[in-house]
Amino acid sequence: MNNSQISTVTQFVLLGFPGPWKIQIIFFSMILLVYIFTLTGNMAIICAVRWDHRLHTPMYVLLANFSFLEIWYVTCTVPNMLVNFFSKTKTISFSGCFTQFHFFFSLGTTECFFLCVMAYDRYLAICHPLHYPSIMTGQLCGILVSLCWLIGFLGHSISIFFIFQLPFCGPNIIDHFLCDVDPLMALSSAPTHIIGHVFHSVSSLFINLTMVYILGSYTLVLRTVLQVPSSAGWQKAISTCGSHLVVVSLFYGAIMLMYVSPTPGNSVAMHKLITLIYSVVTPVLNPLIYSLRNKDMKYALHHVFCGMRIIQRS
C-alpha cells in the first residue's frame, strides 16, 4: 500500500439530512438550539464549580470535568453538521474527517468511563457515607479523571490508526452527518473485515464492562436507600438513581445498537437517528439530570448569574 493510493481521495461528502428545504431549516434550528443549550448548561456548571468554593468537592469536580467533556463531545460534530445544512458541496477534508472520527470515538469512550467514575462516587457517598471523605479524596478524584481521559483516547488509537491507513480510491460519499466507522470503512478499496472486527470488539468490551459496572453500582445504591424505613427512602431512591439511569439507558441503548450488536437491516435513516440520540440528545440532558436538579448546584448557579448581572450593570 503506497501513499499515493491513500491520498487518492482528498475529501468526503457528508450527505447529512437530505430533504425539502423547509424541513432542513426546522431541523437546523432545532439542532442549533440544542447545541446552544448544551454549551450554556455545561459552561454554567463549570463556572459554578470554579467560583463557588462550597462545590470544591469530588462529586462536583467530577461534574465539572464531565461538563467539559460534553462540550467537546458535541463540538466535534455539531458545528460541521450545522454548516453542512447550508453547504452546496457538503464536503469535509480527508484529514478533517479522520480528526472528527478520532475525537468522536475517543470522547465517547471517555464518557463511558466518566459515567463509571460518577456511579462509583454515588455508590461511596450513599452506601459508605462515613468512609466517603477518606476514600474519595481530591488526589483519587484527580487520578480517576486522568485515567478516564487516558483510556478514552488510547483505547481506540490502534484501530483508528489502521483505519486511517486504509486506501480510499473510489467513491467518497458518506450518507451520514458525521464520519462514522462503518460508512467510512465501506468506502475503502481494501478489505476491512479484520479491522472492523477489532474495532467493534474493543467497543463492545468497553461498553459492556462500563455498563455492567454502572448498573451494579446503582443497584447497590437502590438497595441501600430502600432500606430506609420510610417513604422518603423511595423518593430518595427515585431522585438519586431513576433520572440518572434514564440518561445512562438512553446513551448505552443507542451505542449498543450501533457498535455492540449492529443490525445490518436497519435503514440509513435509523442509523442517523440512533447516532443523533447519543451524540446530541444525551449531552443536552446531562446538565439537567446530573446537576441542574441539584439544590446546591442551583444555588451556586443563581449566584453566578446574579454576579454576571452586577458586572454587566457596572
Swiss-Prot record:
InterPro entries from the UniProt entry: GPCR_Rhodpsn (IPR000276), GPCR_Rhodpsn_7TM (IPR017452), Olfact_rcpt (IPR000725), Olfactory_GPCR1 (IPR050939)
Question: Keyword set for this entry?
Answer: Cell membrane, Disulfide bond, G-protein coupled receptor, Glycoprotein, Membrane, Olfaction, Receptor, Sensory transduction, Transducer, Transmembrane, Transmembrane helix
What family name appears in the similarity comment? Belongs to the G-protein coupled receptor 1 family.
Q: Which organism is it from?
A: Homo sapiens (Human)
The protein's name: Olfactory receptor 11H7
Q: Where in the cell does this protein reside?
A: Cell membrane
Gene Ontology cellular component terms for the protein in this record: plasma membrane
| Membrane-crossing segments per the record | 25-45, 58-78, 98-118, 143-163, 202-222, 245-265, 272-292
Q: Which residue intervals are topologically Extracellular?
A: 1-24, 79-97, 164-201, 266-271
What domain of life does the native source organism fall in? Eukaryota
Q: Which PANTHER family match?
A: G-PROTEIN COUPLED RECEPTOR (PTHR24242), OLFACTORY RECEPTOR 11H7 (PTHR24242:SF252)
Its Gene Ontology molecular function terms?
A: G protein-coupled receptor activity; olfactory receptor activity
Q: Which residues are glycosylated?
A: N2
